[in-house]
Amino acid sequence: MKRNNSKKVRVEPTRRPKKNPLKARGIEAVDYKDIETLRTFISERGKIRSRRVTGLTPQQQRQVATAVKNAREMALLPFTSR
């Protein structure tokens, strides 16, 4: 029986750069009064979505989290939604 001695070369797919939703909207700094933008980063249950889901940079994720918390304190966003 004949053996195939050639090794398979693994081809890794090229990574596409993540789409940044804030950059696409032209937003540099996140504002807690911009409720429409903040709602895109909140789940149906009222939780802040993770970076992996939203595609934000670490700095932007911190800004969004702080803005959401401020908006909740100012009663612009609910703490939970039922």
Swiss-Prot record:
This protein's source sits in the domain of life called Bacteria
Q: One biological-process term from Gene Ontology?
A: translation
TM spans (from-to)? none
Tell me a GO cellular component: cytosolic small ribosomal subunit
> Could you cite one Gene Ontology molecular function of this protein?
small ribosomal subunit rRNA binding
Q: Which UniProt keywords apply?
A: Ribonucleoprotein, Ribosomal protein, RNA-binding, rRNA-binding
Task: Give the start-end ranges of region Disordered.
Answer: 1-21
As for what it does, the entry says:
Binds as a heterodimer with protein bS6 to the central domain of the 16S rRNA, where it helps stabilize the platform of the 30S subunit.
Which HAMAP family does the annotation name?
A: Ribosomal_bS18
Q: Which family does it belong to?
A: Belongs to the bacterial ribosomal protein bS18 family.
Which proteins does it associate with, and in what oligomeric form? Answer: Part of the 30S ribosomal subunit. Forms a tight heterodimer with protein bS6.
PANTHER family given for it?
30S RIBOSOMAL PROTEIN S18, SMALL RIBOSOMAL SUBUNIT PROTEIN BS18M
Q: What is this protein called?
A: Small ribosomal subunit protein bS18
Which organism encodes this protein? Corynebacterium kroppenstedtii (strain DSM 44385 / JCM 11950 / CIP 105744 / CCUG 35717)
